[in-house]
Protein backbone atom coordinates (compact mmCIF):
# COMPACT_ATOMS: atom_id res chain seq x y z
CA UNK A 1 0.00 0.00 0.00
CA UNK A 2 1.38 3.39 -0.97
CA UNK A 3 1.38 6.07 1.70
CA UNK A 4 2.64 9.09 -0.19
CA UNK A 5 2.55 9.59 -3.92
CA UNK A 6 5.03 12.12 -5.21
CA UNK A 7 5.38 13.79 -8.58
CA UNK A 8 8.98 14.53 -9.54
CA UNK A 9 7.71 17.79 -10.99
CA UNK A 10 7.35 19.32 -7.56
CA UNK A 11 11.12 19.43 -7.15
CA UNK A 12 11.40 21.21 -10.50
CA UNK A 13 8.68 23.67 -9.53
CA UNK A 14 10.26 24.57 -6.23
CA UNK A 15 13.97 24.62 -6.83
CA UNK A 16 14.72 23.36 -10.33
CA UNK A 17 16.77 20.52 -8.91
CA UNK A 18 17.79 17.63 -11.16
CA UNK A 19 17.17 14.07 -10.08
CA UNK A 20 20.21 11.89 -9.41
CA UNK A 21 19.41 9.22 -6.83
CA UNK A 22 22.10 6.61 -7.55
CA UNK A 23 24.03 7.15 -4.31
CA UNK A 24 20.83 7.40 -2.33
CA UNK A 25 19.64 4.11 -3.80
CA UNK A 26 22.78 2.33 -2.65
CA UNK A 27 22.38 3.71 0.85
CA UNK A 28 18.68 2.83 0.89
CA UNK A 29 19.55 -0.78 0.17
CA UNK A 30 21.80 -0.96 3.22
CA UNK A 31 19.15 0.70 5.36
CA UNK A 32 16.45 -1.73 4.25
CA UNK A 33 18.74 -4.67 5.01
CA UNK A 34 19.61 -3.58 8.56
CA UNK A 35 16.13 -2.41 9.56
CA UNK A 36 14.85 -6.01 9.43
CA UNK A 37 16.53 -6.87 12.72
CA UNK A 38 14.90 -3.86 14.35
CA UNK A 39 11.49 -5.01 13.18
CA UNK A 40 11.96 -8.27 15.06
CA UNK A 41 12.59 -6.41 18.29
CA UNK A 42 9.44 -4.39 17.80
CA UNK A 43 7.48 -7.58 17.16
CA UNK A 44 8.30 -8.93 20.60
CA UNK A 45 7.79 -5.64 22.41
CA UNK A 46 4.30 -4.92 21.08
CA UNK A 47 2.98 -7.82 23.15
CA UNK A 48 3.84 -5.89 26.31
CA UNK A 49 1.20 -3.78 28.11
CA UNK A 50 0.84 -0.24 26.83
CA UNK A 51 1.94 2.67 29.01
CA UNK A 52 1.57 6.31 28.02
CA UNK A 53 1.90 6.29 24.26
CA UNK A 54 1.78 9.53 22.25
CA UNK A 55 0.61 7.49 19.26
CA UNK A 56 -2.16 5.96 21.32
CA UNK A 57 -2.92 9.39 22.77
CA UNK A 58 -3.15 10.81 19.25
CA UNK A 59 -5.48 7.95 18.33
CA UNK A 60 -7.80 8.49 21.29
CA UNK A 61 -10.99 10.50 21.35
CA UNK A 62 -13.43 12.48 23.44
CA UNK A 63 -17.17 12.22 23.78
CA UNK A 64 -18.84 14.98 21.75
CA UNK A 65 -20.90 16.07 24.77
CA UNK A 66 -17.69 16.80 26.68
CA UNK A 67 -16.25 19.14 24.02
CA UNK A 68 -16.59 22.87 24.66
CA UNK A 69 -17.35 24.68 21.40
CA UNK A 70 -15.04 27.49 22.48
CA UNK A 71 -12.12 25.04 22.36
CA UNK A 72 -12.79 23.86 18.81
CA UNK A 73 -10.23 24.81 16.15
CA UNK A 74 -11.01 25.24 12.46
CA UNK A 75 -9.28 22.78 10.12
CA UNK A 76 -9.54 23.07 6.32
CA UNK A 77 -10.01 19.72 4.60
CA UNK A 78 -9.36 18.97 0.94
CA UNK A 79 -12.52 16.94 0.46
CA UNK A 80 -11.66 15.89 -3.09
CA UNK A 81 -8.15 14.59 -2.40
CA UNK A 82 -7.56 10.84 -2.33
CA UNK A 83 -8.39 7.65 -4.19
CA UNK A 84 -11.85 7.34 -2.65
CA UNK A 85 -12.85 10.98 -2.09
CA UNK A 86 -15.12 12.59 -1.18
CA UNK A 87 -17.12 9.88 0.67
CA UNK A 88 -14.59 8.44 3.17
CA UNK A 89 -13.09 11.90 3.73
CA UNK A 90 -16.49 13.29 4.70
CA UNK A 91 -17.24 10.27 6.88
CA UNK A 92 -13.94 10.72 8.72
CA UNK A 93 -14.57 14.44 9.21
CA UNK A 94 -18.01 13.84 10.73
CA UNK A 95 -16.53 11.22 13.04
CA UNK A 96 -13.70 13.57 14.03
CA UNK A 97 -16.15 16.35 14.89
CA UNK A 98 -17.79 14.01 17.41
CA UNK A 99 -14.47 12.96 18.93
CA UNK A 100 -12.16 15.97 18.71
CA UNK A 101 -12.32 19.68 19.62
CA UNK A 102 -12.30 20.88 16.03
CA UNK A 103 -14.52 22.31 13.32
CA UNK A 104 -14.20 21.50 9.63
CA UNK A 105 -14.20 23.67 6.54
CA UNK A 106 -14.85 20.93 3.99
CA UNK A 107 -13.65 22.03 0.54
CA UNK A 108 -14.97 20.31 -2.55
CA UNK A 109 -17.41 20.11 -5.43
CA UNK A 110 -20.69 20.55 -3.57
CA UNK A 111 -22.81 18.34 -5.84
CA UNK A 112 -20.38 15.43 -5.50
CA UNK A 113 -20.09 15.91 -1.75
CA UNK A 114 -23.85 15.88 -1.24
CA UNK A 115 -24.23 12.85 -3.51
CA UNK A 116 -21.58 10.98 -1.51
CA UNK A 117 -23.29 11.94 1.77
CA UNK A 118 -26.59 10.57 0.48
CA UNK A 119 -25.12 7.31 -0.84
CA UNK A 120 -23.31 6.65 2.47
CA UNK A 121 -26.28 7.57 4.64
CA UNK A 122 -24.46 10.61 6.05
CA UNK A 123 -26.89 13.30 4.94
CA UNK A 124 -28.54 13.70 8.35
CA UNK A 125 -25.20 13.79 10.19
CA UNK A 126 -23.88 16.33 7.68
CA UNK A 127 -26.85 18.65 8.09
CA UNK A 128 -26.66 18.30 11.87
CA UNK A 129 -22.97 19.27 11.88
CA UNK A 130 -23.68 22.26 9.63
CA UNK A 131 -26.57 23.41 11.82
CA UNK A 132 -24.35 23.20 14.92
CA UNK A 133 -21.71 25.34 13.24
CA UNK A 134 -19.19 22.50 13.32
CA UNK A 135 -18.87 22.03 9.55
CA UNK A 136 -18.90 24.42 6.60
CA UNK A 137 -19.04 23.38 2.97
CA UNK A 138 -16.70 25.47 0.81
CA UNK A 139 -17.12 25.23 -2.95
CA UNK A 140 -14.16 24.50 -5.20
CA UNK A 141 -13.49 23.75 -8.84
CA UNK A 142 -12.27 20.48 -10.40
CA UNK A 143 -9.86 18.57 -8.21
CA UNK A 144 -6.26 17.61 -8.94
CA UNK A 145 -6.08 13.89 -9.69
CA UNK A 146 -3.71 11.45 -8.03
CA UNK A 147 -1.91 10.98 -11.35
CA UNK A 148 -1.72 14.66 -12.28
CA UNK A 149 1.58 16.49 -12.36
CA UNK A 150 2.29 18.82 -9.46
CA UNK A 151 2.24 21.70 -11.96
CA UNK A 152 -1.55 21.29 -12.00
CA UNK A 153 -1.74 23.46 -8.87
CA UNK A 154 -0.92 26.44 -11.07
CA UNK A 155 -3.34 25.56 -13.85
CA UNK A 156 -6.25 24.68 -11.56
CA UNK A 157 -6.25 27.71 -9.29
CA UNK A 158 -9.66 26.87 -7.80
CA UNK A 159 -8.81 23.20 -7.13
CA UNK A 160 -9.85 21.96 -3.70
CA UNK A 161 -6.30 21.78 -2.33
CA UNK A 162 -5.59 25.39 -3.37
CA UNK A 163 -8.83 26.65 -1.84
CA UNK A 164 -8.06 24.77 1.39
CA UNK A 165 -4.55 26.24 1.56
CA UNK A 166 -5.96 29.73 1.01
CA UNK A 167 -8.24 29.28 4.03
CA UNK A 168 -5.16 28.78 6.20
CA UNK A 169 -3.37 31.70 4.58
CA UNK A 170 -6.36 34.00 5.26
CA UNK A 171 -6.58 32.84 8.88
CA UNK A 172 -9.93 31.10 8.39
CA UNK A 173 -8.42 27.75 9.41
CA UNK A 174 -5.48 26.83 11.62
CA UNK A 175 -4.42 23.73 9.70
CA UNK A 176 -5.08 21.95 6.43
CA UNK A 177 -5.44 18.25 5.67
CA UNK A 178 -5.35 16.49 2.32
CA UNK A 179 -5.15 12.86 1.24
CA UNK A 180 -4.54 13.94 -2.33
CA UNK A 181 -1.52 13.85 -4.61
CA UNK A 182 1.33 14.63 -2.20
CA UNK A 183 3.39 16.36 -4.88
CA UNK A 184 0.49 18.70 -5.56
CA UNK A 185 -0.13 19.20 -1.83
CA UNK A 186 3.49 20.17 -1.30
CA UNK A 187 3.53 22.49 -4.31
CA UNK A 188 0.28 24.14 -3.23
CA UNK A 189 1.58 24.63 0.31
CA UNK A 190 4.76 26.26 -0.96
CA UNK A 191 3.01 28.55 -3.45
CA UNK A 192 0.07 29.41 -1.21
CA UNK A 193 1.60 29.46 2.28
CA UNK A 194 5.26 29.96 1.47
CA UNK A 195 8.31 28.44 3.07
CA UNK A 196 9.63 29.47 6.45
CA UNK A 197 12.63 31.77 6.14
CA UNK A 198 15.81 29.80 6.54
CA UNK A 199 14.22 26.57 5.28
CA UNK A 200 15.30 25.61 1.77
CA UNK A 201 13.10 22.54 1.40
CA UNK A 202 10.02 21.43 3.36
CA UNK A 203 10.09 17.82 4.55
CA UNK A 204 7.43 15.19 5.19
CA UNK A 205 7.73 13.78 8.70
CA UNK A 206 6.09 10.47 9.65
CA UNK A 207 5.74 8.81 13.05
CA UNK A 208 6.91 5.21 13.37
CA UNK A 209 6.20 2.94 16.35
CA UNK A 210 9.21 1.67 18.30
CA UNK A 211 9.82 -1.15 20.77
CA UNK A 212 9.02 1.35 23.53
CA UNK A 213 5.26 2.02 23.36
CA UNK A 214 5.74 5.47 24.85
CA UNK A 215 8.36 6.67 22.38
CA UNK A 216 7.44 6.89 18.71
CA UNK A 217 10.17 8.12 16.41
CA UNK A 218 9.71 10.93 13.90
CA UNK A 219 11.41 10.17 10.58
CA UNK A 220 11.90 12.91 8.00
CA UNK A 221 12.12 13.28 5.08
CA UNK A 222 9.97 10.37 3.85
CA UNK A 223 9.38 11.46 0.29
CA UNK A 224 9.37 15.19 -0.41
CA UNK A 225 13.01 15.58 -1.53
CA UNK A 226 14.80 12.89 -3.50
CA UNK A 227 18.10 14.73 -3.69
CA UNK A 228 19.39 16.56 -0.63
CA UNK A 229 22.28 18.74 0.44
CA UNK A 230 23.76 18.55 3.95
CA UNK A 231 22.12 21.88 4.79
CA UNK A 232 18.70 20.40 3.97
CA UNK A 233 19.15 17.52 6.42
CA UNK A 234 20.40 19.98 9.03
CA UNK A 235 17.19 21.95 8.58
CA UNK A 236 15.09 18.77 8.77
CA UNK A 237 16.66 18.06 12.14
CA UNK A 238 15.74 21.52 13.43
CA UNK A 239 12.15 21.10 12.23
CA UNK A 240 11.84 17.61 13.71
CA UNK A 241 13.32 18.75 17.00
CA UNK A 242 10.57 21.34 17.47
CA UNK A 243 7.79 18.94 16.49
CA UNK A 244 9.05 16.22 18.82
CA UNK A 245 9.39 18.68 21.69
CA UNK A 246 6.04 20.44 21.23
CA UNK A 247 3.66 17.70 20.11
CA UNK A 248 5.26 14.49 21.40
CA UNK A 249 6.34 16.20 24.62
CA UNK A 250 9.96 15.02 24.48
CA UNK A 251 11.95 17.45 26.60
CA UNK A 252 15.28 16.91 24.83
CA UNK A 253 14.78 15.03 21.56
CA UNK A 254 17.63 12.74 20.54
CA UNK A 255 18.45 13.39 16.90
CA UNK A 256 19.85 10.61 14.74
CA UNK A 257 21.27 10.64 11.22
CA UNK A 258 20.23 7.58 9.22
CA UNK A 259 23.42 5.92 8.03
CA UNK A 260 25.02 2.56 7.26
CA UNK A 261 27.18 2.55 10.40
CA UNK A 262 27.50 4.13 13.83
CA UNK A 263 31.03 5.45 13.28
CA UNK A 264 31.53 9.07 12.22
CA UNK A 265 33.64 7.97 9.25
CA UNK A 266 30.86 5.82 7.72
CA UNK A 267 28.55 6.82 4.91
CA UNK A 268 28.60 8.77 1.68
CA UNK A 269 29.58 12.39 1.19
CA UNK A 270 26.10 13.59 2.16
CA UNK A 271 26.22 11.64 5.43
CA UNK A 272 29.71 12.78 6.37
CA UNK A 273 29.03 16.46 5.80
CA UNK A 274 25.63 16.31 7.48
CA UNK A 275 27.18 14.61 10.50
CA UNK A 276 29.53 17.56 10.95
CA UNK A 277 26.67 20.07 10.79
CA UNK A 278 24.52 18.18 13.30
CA UNK A 279 27.43 17.56 15.64
CA UNK A 280 28.23 21.28 15.77
CA UNK A 281 24.61 22.47 16.11
CA UNK A 282 24.11 23.79 19.65
CA UNK A 283 20.30 23.80 19.36
CA UNK A 284 20.18 20.03 18.93
CA UNK A 285 20.96 16.98 21.04
CA UNK A 286 22.68 15.02 18.31
CA UNK A 287 22.92 11.36 19.31
CA UNK A 288 25.00 10.27 16.32
CA UNK A 289 24.44 7.99 13.38
CA UNK A 290 21.38 5.74 13.38
CA UNK A 291 21.64 2.44 11.54
CA UNK A 292 18.55 0.96 9.93
CA UNK A 293 18.18 -1.57 12.74
CA UNK A 294 18.10 1.26 15.29
CA UNK A 295 15.25 3.28 13.78
CA UNK A 296 12.67 1.28 15.76
CA UNK A 297 14.86 0.78 18.83
CA UNK A 298 13.50 3.70 20.84
CA UNK A 299 17.01 5.14 21.15
CA UNK A 300 16.18 8.10 18.89
CA UNK A 301 13.30 10.56 18.92
CA UNK A 302 13.99 12.06 15.49
CA UNK A 303 15.78 10.44 12.55
CA UNK A 304 16.73 12.49 9.50
CA UNK A 305 17.49 11.26 5.99
CA UNK A 306 16.95 12.22 2.37
CA UNK A 307 13.49 11.65 0.93
CA UNK A 308 14.56 8.76 -1.30
CA UNK A 309 15.96 6.69 1.55
CA UNK A 310 13.15 7.72 3.88
CA UNK A 311 10.49 6.64 1.43
CA UNK A 312 12.15 3.25 0.95
CA UNK A 313 12.17 2.83 4.73
CA UNK A 314 8.55 3.93 4.95
CA UNK A 315 7.34 1.48 2.30
CA UNK A 316 9.29 -1.35 3.92
CA UNK A 317 7.77 -0.68 7.33
CA UNK A 318 4.29 -0.63 5.80
CA UNK A 319 4.63 -4.35 5.24
CA UNK A 320 5.82 -5.22 8.75
CA UNK A 321 2.39 -5.37 10.40
CA UNK A 322 0.77 -7.71 7.90
CA UNK A 323 3.89 -9.91 7.68
CA UNK A 324 4.14 -10.30 11.47
CA UNK A 325 0.48 -11.17 11.82
CA UNK A 326 0.77 -13.66 8.98
CA UNK A 327 3.80 -15.33 10.58
CA UNK A 328 2.10 -15.55 13.98
CA UNK A 329 -1.04 -17.06 12.50
CA UNK A 330 0.97 -19.53 10.43
CA UNK A 331 2.92 -20.70 13.48
CA UNK A 332 -0.19 -21.45 15.55
CA UNK A 333 -0.93 -25.17 15.56
CA UNK A 334 -3.97 -26.31 13.62
CA UNK A 335 -7.01 -27.96 15.11
CA UNK A 336 -8.35 -27.55 18.63
CA UNK A 337 -5.01 -26.46 20.12
CA UNK A 338 -4.69 -23.74 17.51
CA UNK A 339 -8.18 -22.42 18.21
CA UNK A 340 -7.46 -22.28 21.95
CA UNK A 341 -4.16 -20.49 21.31
CA UNK A 342 -5.83 -18.02 18.97
CA UNK A 343 -8.44 -17.23 21.61
CA UNK A 344 -5.73 -16.39 24.15
CA UNK A 345 -3.75 -14.29 21.67
CA UNK A 346 -6.67 -12.48 20.05
CA UNK A 347 -6.31 -9.30 22.12
CA UNK A 348 -2.53 -9.29 21.62
CA UNK A 349 -2.89 -9.68 17.87
CA UNK A 350 -5.38 -6.83 17.74
CA UNK A 351 -2.94 -4.65 19.69
CA UNK A 352 -0.11 -5.50 17.32
CA UNK A 353 -2.27 -4.65 14.33
CA UNK A 354 -3.35 -1.36 15.88
CA UNK A 355 0.21 -0.27 16.65
CA UNK A 356 1.61 -1.21 13.24
CA UNK A 357 -1.35 -0.36 11.00
CA UNK A 358 -0.60 2.82 9.04
CA UNK A 359 -4.30 3.70 9.06
CA UNK A 360 -4.05 4.23 12.81
CA UNK A 361 -1.43 6.94 12.34
CA UNK A 362 -3.32 8.75 9.59
CA UNK A 363 -0.81 11.02 7.97
CA UNK A 364 2.33 13.08 8.20
CA UNK A 365 3.13 16.73 8.67
CA UNK A 366 4.67 18.79 5.93
CA UNK A 367 7.22 20.69 8.00
CA UNK A 368 8.90 23.85 6.77
CA UNK A 369 5.96 25.73 5.26
CA UNK A 370 4.28 28.73 6.85
CA UNK A 371 1.26 26.84 8.10
CA UNK A 372 0.24 23.46 9.49
CA UNK A 373 -0.28 21.00 6.65
CA UNK A 374 -0.98 17.29 7.07
CA UNK A 375 -0.68 14.86 4.16
CA UNK A 376 -2.75 11.69 4.38
CA UNK A 377 -2.52 8.38 2.56
CA UNK A 378 -4.01 8.40 -0.91
CA UNK A 379 -6.08 5.37 0.08
CA UNK A 380 -7.35 6.98 3.29
CA UNK A 381 -10.59 5.72 4.74
CA UNK A 382 -12.53 7.25 7.64
CA UNK A 383 -10.21 5.92 10.38
CA UNK A 384 -7.13 7.38 8.69
CA UNK A 385 -8.87 10.73 8.27
CA UNK A 386 -9.73 10.92 11.98
CA UNK A 387 -6.13 10.09 12.93
CA UNK A 388 -4.73 12.67 10.52
CA UNK A 389 -7.10 15.37 11.78
CA UNK A 390 -5.97 14.58 15.31
CA UNK A 391 -2.37 15.20 14.24
CA UNK A 392 -3.41 18.51 12.67
CA UNK A 393 -5.27 19.55 15.80
CA UNK A 394 -2.37 18.56 18.06
CA UNK A 395 0.12 20.57 16.02
CA UNK A 396 -2.16 23.63 16.02
CA UNK A 397 -3.03 23.46 19.71
CA UNK A 398 0.58 22.94 20.85
CA UNK A 399 1.90 26.12 19.22
CA UNK A 400 4.17 24.41 16.71
CA UNK A 401 4.08 27.34 14.28
CA UNK A 402 5.08 29.81 16.99
CA UNK A 403 8.18 27.78 17.80
CA UNK A 404 8.99 27.13 14.14
CA UNK A 405 8.93 30.89 13.65
CA UNK A 406 11.98 31.12 15.92
CA UNK A 407 14.00 29.39 13.19
CA UNK A 408 13.46 32.48 11.04
CA UNK A 409 15.24 34.80 13.44
CA UNK A 410 18.31 36.24 11.82
CA UNK A 411 17.23 35.15 8.33
CA UNK A 412 16.06 38.55 7.09
Residue positions per predicted region:
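Short, glycine-rich nucleotide/cofactor-binding loops
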Residues: 74-87, 224-234, 375-382
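Glycine-rich phosphate-binding loop
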Residues: 28, 167-186, 266, 271-353
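Composition-driven recognition of long, low-complexity, acid-poor segments enriched in small hydrophobic
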Residues: 6-47
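Glycine-rich phosphate/diphosphate-binding loop of Rossmann-like nucleotide-binding domains
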Residues: 86-88, 100-105, 226-292, 301, ...
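Phosphate/nucleotide-donor binding subsite
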Residues: 124-173
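N-terminal phosphate-binding or glycine-rich loops at protein starts, especially the Walker A/P-loop
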Residues: 28, 49-115
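Glycine-rich phosphate/nucleotide-binding loop
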Residues: 190-219, 299-303, 307-412
Amino acid sequence: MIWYRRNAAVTTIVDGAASSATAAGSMAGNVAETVVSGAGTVASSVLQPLGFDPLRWLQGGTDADEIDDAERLWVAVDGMGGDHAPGPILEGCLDAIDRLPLKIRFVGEIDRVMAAATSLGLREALESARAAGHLDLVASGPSIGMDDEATAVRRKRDASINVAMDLVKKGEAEAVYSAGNSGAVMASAIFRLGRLKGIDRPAIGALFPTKDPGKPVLVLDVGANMDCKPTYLHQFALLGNIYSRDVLQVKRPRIGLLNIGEEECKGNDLSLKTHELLRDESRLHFAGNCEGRDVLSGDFDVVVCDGFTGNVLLKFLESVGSVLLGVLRAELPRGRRGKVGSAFLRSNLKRIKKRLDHAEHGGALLLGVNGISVIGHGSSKALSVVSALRIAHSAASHGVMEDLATLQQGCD
